[in-house]
Amino acid sequence: MFLRSDLAVTHWVSRSMRKLFLVLSLLLSQAAHLEGRKDNQFLWKTGPWGRCAGDCGPGGAQSRAVWCFHIEGWTSPMSNCDESSQPPKERSCFRVCDWHSDLFQWEVSDWHRCLLVPGAQGEPRPRAVECVTAQHGLQHRTVRCLQKLNRTMVSNEICEHFAPQPPTEQACLIPCPRDCVVSEFSPWSTCPEGCGKKLQHRTRVAIAPPLYGGLQCPNLTESRACEAPVSCPLGKEEYSFSLKVGPWSKCRLPHLKEVDLSGRNIQDFSSDSNEQVTLTHQSYKAHHHSQPGDVVIGFQTRQVWCTRSDGRNALLSLCVRDSFPLTVQPCVMPKDCETSEWSPWSPCSKTCRSGTLSPGVRSRSRNVKHIAIGGGQECPELLEKETCIAEGEFLQPCPRYSWRTSEWKECQVSLLLEQHDPLWHETGPICGGGIQTREVYCAQSLPATIASRTKEVSRPVERTLCLGPAPSASQLCNVPCSMDCIVSSWSTWGPCVFENCHDPQGKKGFRMRQRHVLMESTGPMGRCPHLAESVPCEDPMCHRWLASEGICIADHGKCGLGHRILKAVCQNERGEEVSGGLCPVPPPPERMACEIPCRMDCVVSEWTVWSSCSQSCSNKNSDGKQTRSRSILALAGEGGKTCPSSQELQEYRLCNDHSCTQLYWETSAWGSCSENTLVTALNVTIGWNGEATCGVGIQTRKVFCIKSHVGQVMTKRCPESTRPETVRPCFLPCKKDCLVTAFSEWTPCPRPCQPGNTTIKQSRYRIIIQEAANGGQECPDTLFEERECEDISLCPSYRWKPQKWSSCILVPESIRQGRTGTSEACGKGLQTRAVSCISDDNQSAEMTECLKQMNGMPPLVQECTIPCRDDCTFTPWSKFTPCSKNCEATQIRRRQLTGKSRKKEKCQDASLYPLVEMEPCPCDTFMSHPYGNWSACILPEGKRDAQQGGLWVQGDDKECGEGVRFRAIACSNINGRPVDPSFCNSSGYIQEACVIPCPFDCKLSDWSSWGSCSSSCGIGVRIRSKWLKEKPYSGGRPCPKLDLKNQVHEAVPCYSECDQYSWVVEHWSPCKINNELRSPRCGRGTQSRRIRCVSTADREGGAVNRSLCNQDDAPQETQACSLLCPSECVMSEWGTWSRCPQSCDPHAMQRRTRHLLRPSLNSRTCGEDSQVRPCLLNENCFQFQYNLTEWSTCQLSENVSCGQGVRTRLLSCVRSDGKSVSMDHCEQRNLEKPQRMSIPCLVECVVNCQLSGWTTWTECSQTCGQGGRMSRTRFIIMPTQGEGRQCPTELTQQKPCPVTPCYSWVLGNWSACKLEGGDCGEGVQVRSFSCVVHNGSISHTAVPVEEALCGEVPFQEGILKQLCSVPCPGDCHITPWSEWSKCELTCIDGRSFETTGRQSRSRTFIIQSFENQDSCPQQVLETRPCTGGKCYHYIWKASLWNNNERTVWCQRSDGLNVTGGCSPQARPAAIRQCIPACKKPFSYCTQGGVCGCEKGYTEIMRSSGFLDYCMKVPGSEDKKADVKNLSGKNRPVNSKIHDIFKGWSLQPLDPDGRVKMWVYGVSGGSFLIMIFLVFTSYLVCKKPKPHQSTPRHQKPLTLAYDGDLDM
């Protein structure tokens, strides 16, 4: 009882204590909560960061406000907030300045792949159940702010100062998810032999990776236990054991505690048991190997343990048999690369002020003191650069550079003429289109303020300093052609006048005629002929009386004697009316006697006007004559005055009695413009050099008096008034001094030394920018200077100087004994040596100097071996046996075993220890064979004239003709080893002559002479032509468009003066009465006259062919006439019609009159004495206007093919009826005359493509081997103009390089994993390297050669050695990579969604023991992009049903069976099952899971959708009995139709039990039919209402619907 009560008390106390503890805990928790709430009531709050202040760059600072506030929103003292969590008030920043915009920029990457939008909190989005085509995605890109110079990333705030940050993400669409697709499993592996538990496995590989959120790949491996394992018999071990070695430890030096390890034991910590391995050790004696100071030898160890085939550890003794594996070895202690301190920063590269505020660059460097050894840290960057800004207010502005040009050189017409005709040669002055060139160079641009103060011209610099395209160095130009004046015809000879009417002297005068300039001369050689001619004459008179006669007025009565009134006016030599006081005294009488015939008198007409003079001048043989005549109008009656004789009816007088020899002034060409000191002193223009260079000068010429047909005569024979000027002012051409640029800077000499023992020269040049002209200072002779570089020493060369190798260093004896238990100093060790850098004079140098000049550094450490007692020993190798001259011979060397090795069996294994070595003998027989294709035909290079600006001229590189083509030769020895072509006595090429056909242009004849004008009066056409001589071929210039006769024509308008040929008429013959028997002989008759066509230019007035005169204006040769009888009234001839107004107003009248000469005897009234008629246009009234032709084509001078020409148009006077008339008609009416009858024009020059010369051949594209090419290029200087030869497409030429052998280091394959005594575990793989010779591509045909031919070894230890592992039995290991799958595109509806496809490969793991499967690695899937992929689709395939079961699998469109890829929702059923079971006769379970009927039966379904029974189709050949018989006749049913309608004819439900759509359709259609029938019945049965209202007037029926159904 006591015990029980005691326990109860104890229990009560403990419960009370627990309750008390719980209450205290709650109190403390509440207090802490309240305190925490108190602390959390005050929080820190910060404002935005202010502007960055300070210097530009990273040295700025910015601040912000920080305060404490209560959670309710009011500000609190700072002490209420926790000071430890107070945010900082200041921070450093990068102050952005304006010039930083050139330093920093946003760098935007390409958009990444479109990825699915992640779900909330970064979780993967749940896969959509239905995805039709695409799903929403998101794609990102990287946006960062970069410093342009070194491409380093800086804060985004810097770039945001200049431009907003580009977006980093955007929405996109991606295809529906695609699951991982894998292949089918491989067959199960065979079970391993032996007893015990064994596993077998099977694997599959990845075909396509998961994309766009698809499912990951399933397991690629499966394992299972072998069936019926064989139990191990008694006495046999169930497990196998393997010695496993671990990785080597890091290299270290021995510690002091490892000095003496004698007698200690080493625990085998790798074993699961507590087995100890006891090893005895000798005492450690310290000794040191001599090592170079840079290399320290340490040691490294590894663990060794025994593992069982099930993966468990076992006793080490179960694995160690003959020899224990190596667990300790010497190694090189790691040593990092050692560099010097940074050098001081170099000066800022920008030492001037530019407008762009772009920064400069400064750098600093450091040198390598010692390279990394033993796997130490490699050397860091040795050069560092950063941007800098040169500060200072007095910085000079940065130089700017721009393209400059010289003046254009003289226009060279010959360049184009040679293109037209290669055989052209200069025979005289040439003109027309040409090409001119100029020099283009780059020079420093001087500011305007500096350029105005300095006299120095620009200095050429490197062309690379100028930005932008260079100006053109050539252009088309024109040398103006000279053309003489075009003058009018001569005027008529004027009267005989004094030479100077203002001061008449002497008794001799001159008769003169003039002509005027129609078109001025052009060009420097254009001349005008003389414009005035004179002939001397007697009795000159400057003023003459000109009298006009009135009609005859009878003095008494109406007939008999009378008088005429004479009206005289005084005219000067120009025909102008002047005062009568100037004419000679006395003036002509005012009255002149005349006679009026009486009634019976003979009546004669008035005198006609004097005819034109028969000759323009008189000579000894003939004189000029003029005639006038009158005719008998009426015969005399009885007692009347008789008619005059025929001689009295005509009068003659002399005219143009001056000589036919004319006098005129002839002038020489104007001389050059020369200075006139009086004039130029007043017209001074000061040039930049302070000398008078321009002004006004004078030109002079000589004047000669020429007598036609004689030559020069005395000047006094010619009238002084027409003497041309001999002096005229002119603009004195400016003197142009030669201007050259300043010399360029000397090309730099190498600093501070020159490589090689050659003479280095530096040069400079200058360019002529203006040639001297007009007596200016000539150009200097020296434009290029060269000199040797002075005080330049040879660059020192450096080389490595290795010391002797040290003795072989082994692991210290104490450590070797403690790890291996042996004291013999043998085995593998290391040798070291020191390597120093020395110059040519054996002086020590920095290691950096050798590293710059040499490729790598000689090795500092090498492996060595100290033979042990049990090792095999040999004699040294003998020398190789001599070689014979046979190329197939070999040479041999031998060695022998020595000592005890001769008795050891392992030493006699020739595969391990060969005693004989053989190698082929060198062969001196070489063969050559061609390689590659022939090069293009290469023409020999010509010399280029520097003065031609790089254009084609005679003697330049040819474009066609004979050339050479090349083919490379490969040289090899008899074994196929490539050697240098010189061994085959060859230059490396086969050369073959070739020909490039020369292009021939279309050749036309010269222009024929111009034909005569097609019109003899007015405007016509002149034609000239060319005809084809040679057709073009081989790319020559094409021909212009030719006519059917292979001719090309050119037509220009022409004008012939209408008075050039005129009709001359003689007087009418007397009127011949028709009836001669009549007396007196009067009445009607005919009269005739003689007409002839004469040339107005012919002095003699001789007749010409009548066809030259205008036939429309030919005068009548016969006309009707009348001879009035004595008793008849006689009237005078009709006067001329009065002039109509110029407007030809039809209301205006034209009038003519005549007067009575003799009244009739019987007082009959005479005829009318006046007539009027209206002014009708184009009948008796004409209007006149100037007619202009169109501008002609551009006319060039003779023998000129292009350039400046003249377009002309012709002016004629045209009557309103379209007839061309003399220009006098338009001139007399003062019509406005067009000003310009010619304008300059330009005929585009046909220019062949102008090319530069070929550049020098480039270096070979390969330093050795086959397939190397060298090339040269040329450039288009001036493209083709017009129909010139096109530029060749081949602007680059290539030819093969000589085939020289290539020597390369080749790495061998990795060796098997060497474990050095272990069975599995961690080991090392090595591979060797060798020097091979090849022809440019390393293949299996590469031949190993001497290593010296390949130079320094470029491989480091990491390339020649790598760690590896060998799995132990029982370990889980990974398989090799599978083959890459086919390239597959992502496609939607059979169309590619992306341009690149994907390939996949995988590797999985193999389980050897289920106990170790947790330690297996993960399976790996690797994907890479690919091109040339295809679109594949995946479909479900199924086998035939077998007992309502079948196999279903997914197959790719190329026939590959896969897992994945097909839609799981569309997977067909693999098991067929109907519920309820199909027990009706002739029924079976269909694929859809519902009961159907066999062939020949149709389904009768219940309303519930289940099968009621199977009904036999009538006419079916199936003889099975029906369940129910149908009444009626059995009609034959087409079985095919039955098959078509079988699936839906009587089945209202689909296989899923849902109502089919046709049921709804039939129901809806039936309902509509019923409504239609009811509505129709209603209309048929409805009674029509009688119409009781009175009919209204019918309105016309319209087509508008008014709502009445009856309509």
From Swiss-Prot:
Membrane-spanning intervals of the chain: 1557-1577
Gene name of the record: Thsd7b
Keywords for this entry?
Disulfide bond, Glycoprotein, Membrane, Repeat, Signal, Transmembrane, Transmembrane helix
Tell me which parts of the chain lie in the Cytoplasmic compartment.
1578-1607
**What residues does the TSP type-1 domain cover?**
40-98, 102-177, 179-233, 336-392, 399-482, 484-543, 601-661, 662-735, 737-796, 797-869, 871-924, 925-999, 1001-1126, 1128-1182, 1183-1246, 1248-1303, 1304-1369, 1371-1432
- Coiled coil is among the record's keywords: no
Top-rank taxon of the source lineage equals Eukaryota
Which positions form S-S bridges? Answer: 411-477, 431-481, 442-466, 602-643, 613-617, 655-660, 738-779, 749-753, 789-795, 937-994, 960-998, 971-984, 1002-1039, 1013-1017, 1121-1125, 1249-1287, 1260-1264, 1297-1302, 1372-1416, 1383-1387, 1426-1431
Task: List localization entries.
Answer: Membrane
Task: Tell me which positions the record assigns to the signal sequence.
Answer: 1-31
**Could you tell me the membrane topology recorded for this protein?**
Single-pass type I membrane protein
**Which residues does the annotation flag as glycosylated?**
150, 219, 683, 757, 842, 933, 985, 1105, 1187, 1199, 1309, 1335, 1457, 1525
Protein name (Swiss-Prot/TrEMBL): Thrombospondin type-1 domain-containing protein 7B
> Which organism is this entry from?
Mus musculus
* Pfam families, A to Z: TSP1_ADAMTS (PF19030), TSP1_spondin (PF19028), TSP1_TSH7A-B_C (PF23308), TSP_1 (PF00090)
